[in-house]
Amino acid sequence: MTILNHTLGFPRVGLRRELKKAQESYWAGNSTREELLAVGRELRARHWDQQKQAGIDLLPVGDFAWYDHVLTTSLLLGNVPARHQNKDGSVDIDTLFRIGRGRAPTGEPAAAAEMTKWFNTNYHYMVPEFVKGQQFKLTWTQLLDEVDEALALGHKVKPVLLGPITWLWLGKVKGEQFDRLSLLNDILPVYQQVLAELAKRGIEWVQIDEPALVLELPQAWLDAYKPAYDALQGQVKLLLTTYFEGVTPNLDTITALPVQGLHVDLVHGKDDVVELHKRLPSDWLLSAGLINGRNVWRADLTEKYVQIKDIVGKRDLWVASSCSLLHSPIDLSVETRLDAEVKSWFAFALQKCHELALLCDALNSGDTAALAEWSAPIQARRHSTRVHNPAVEKRLAAITAQDSQRANVYEVRAEAQRARFKLPAWPTTTIGSFPQTTEIRTLRLDFKKGNLDANNYRTGIAEHIRQAIVEQERLGLDVLVHGEAERNDMVEYFGEHLDGFVFTQNGWVQSYGSRCVKPPIVIGDVSRPAPITVEWAKYAQSMTDKPVKGMLTGPVTILCWSFPREDVSRETIAKQIALALRDEVADLEAAGIGIIQIDEPALREGLPLRRSDWDAYLQWGVEAFRINAAVAKDDTQIHTHMCYCEFNDIMDSIAALDADVITIETSRSDMELLESFEEFDYPNEIGPGVYDIHSPNVPSVEWIEALLKKAAKRIPAERLWVNPDCGLKTRGWPETRAALANMVQAAQNLRRG
């Protein structure tokens, strides 16, 4: 029984983000469709070859996407919203781009499909839309074309296909409501056709992804698996693939399916390998997801060997990445600025392929010497002074319940704040950032590259902050911000100023479409060596009599948008960050900053996949925020900002944050989000976003007034603030001025009654 290795998918964007550049060039009309397609072909060929050279036995095909793999699956099934269709009913790459971004070089612009987080990762997918009575047919043959491409290059391939039930689960019904699961029988013939085409090409195994099987699915959805897979069996061998959590709770459903193998995530799941082996049919192949596909740490291969060795020789076995390597940067070898010790702790996608090859060789031969050699740096890390800071660990251990409590309840604080700030009814503010103009980005880049000295850089930033204050005073806003000209990214900026973080040069991962992010890496205990935001906040406040908000990114968001350590809990990391930022709150307060905003946009997206695990996460997530904020005096007003569309199920936790003011994204939902705050009888102040900053459209005074009146029907007017949905970083100044002027005017009209 020879053990093979495989990956579940590989990063698409290219080492130098070639895909991003090709997409954006094509969208801008600067290159042809054929030039774009050629870049895709070149990247796929390179990535297959790189995986093969690293020792991967079975190469994934179908993991490449022009925008997103869920959207690719939608097109494969002929699921194109009416507003995005070509007049002749054909489907081409521009159809795909119209769904993803609302427009393409050809065809009529139309509202893009909704985008949301892929399970609990920082990748986003395009939500499939379902309407009653829609038809499905094979219309987009990208998967088959790419299989032909890989076979022509002589590769041993394993096509990757998103499974039918997970695809339906991820979608939403539009218009007249019906049960989307009722579409299952309509899409299965298309899946059968695709599998038949793959069988014709001599394909032995197909990886069929059903990550929905790690969720707490309703019984009707679990019951749908057996008839669905009865319909799909028989043409090729199916590797039922799950990830991001364990499968034990749904194992009875899984073991009844007519598939030939199962992939499990043994990194993020709590499944016991020996127990799985006992419960799976004896003729099934088990694909063990042992190498973490969504973090950057080198694996302790000796540990992985021990984890799996008891079932070697007892059943067909493959070793694999836990999930697609899509969530990992591509290649560590091009990182030239990391010091040797820290670099030796990491493994990016290509290094993870090498880890799989080493592990596979050792399991086949029984010789573990190479595993011990590979694992030595990560074992040595456990004792590194770069990792452990006794002062931080001591401070964390000394936290008491008192450290997460403000001195007084909201009602007492609100009175002190009213006396201090004397704000009018319907107070106006913005969320934090102002347009990041070319001048600002050039200034930061020149400084980073060493083309500009520190004095000239600081003079330039100071001028942009001064302009932001002047603009806001001219517009008549009540609570101002400094505009964040000095910040490249709301997480990276703080990571750069905290001990315990490192940064890469090319550690890009895809967020959605052409957007890539370069997350910081938490390598050790987190502390704050010096104040971070105080100087610029103090400078901005010195130029106006109106209050200027201090702006911090909250501990849970910094954690969720970074690559975390694996040797301590996420709770520990979040609380260490909270303690560091608690000192920042105290310093801002001492510098005369009376309103401090702590953004937590990621609080909800950090939720575990299983509801049964939510309470524990929310408990420490809320506690981290409160540790961060609780040092503030009664007359210091703490704001928080959150931007997502679902509050109902976590309202208790939102209230437990005990922020004096929460600003939220509500304009796109026409204030419907406020329903949860009304039903909960949310006690503190709320700023429902009155216009969508993701659109260049300027809202009218009347439109904003109408939204605010609607809000006042749900929340008492004396507790309402007036603000945009989100930061204004991505907007231009002309539309920003126009929109804010209308927003201020609407507030003034309401004050006059």
From Swiss-Prot:
Stated EC number for the protein is 2.1.1.14
**SUPFAM superfamilies membership:** UROD/MetE-like
- Alphabetized UniProt keyword annotations: Amino-acid biosynthesis, Metal-binding, Methionine biosynthesis, Methyltransferase, Repeat, Transferase, Zinc
Residues where 5-methyltetrahydropteroyltri-L-glutamate binds: 17-20, 117, 515-516, 561, 605
Q: Name one GO molecular function term.
A: zinc ion binding
Query: Which InterPro entries would you find in this protein's record?
Result: Cbl-indep_Met_Synth_N, Cobalamin-indep_Met_synthase, Met_Synth_C/arc, UROD/MetE-like_sf
Question: Which positions does UniProt annotate for Zn(2+) binding?
Answer: 641, 643, 665, 726
According to its UniProt record, in which pathway does this protein act? Amino-acid biosynthesis; L-methionine biosynthesis via de novo pathway; L-methionine from L-homocysteine (MetE route): step 1/1
Active site: residue positions: 694
Report the cofactor remark. Answer: Binds 1 zinc ion per subunit.
The entry marks the following residues as binding L-methionine, namely 431-433, 484, 599
Name the coenzymes or cofactors required: Zn(2+)
Catalysed conversion reaction: 5-methyltetrahydropteroyltri-L-glutamate + L-homocysteine = tetrahydropteroyltri-L-glutamate + L-methionine
Q: Per the UniProt entry, what is one GO biological process?
A: methionine biosynthetic process
Q: Kindly list the positions annotated as binding L-homocysteine.
A: 431-433, 484, 599
Where does the source fall among the domains of life?
Answer: Bacteria
Q: Which HAMAP family match?
A: Meth_synth
Function description: Catalyzes the transfer of a methyl group from 5-methyltetrahydrofolate to homocysteine resulting in methionine formation.
Q: Which family does it belong to?
A: Belongs to the vitamin-B12 independent methionine synthase family.
Q: What is this protein called?
A: 5-methyltetrahydropteroyltriglutamate--homocysteine methyltransferase
User: Which species is the source of this protein?
Assistant: Escherichia coli O157:H7
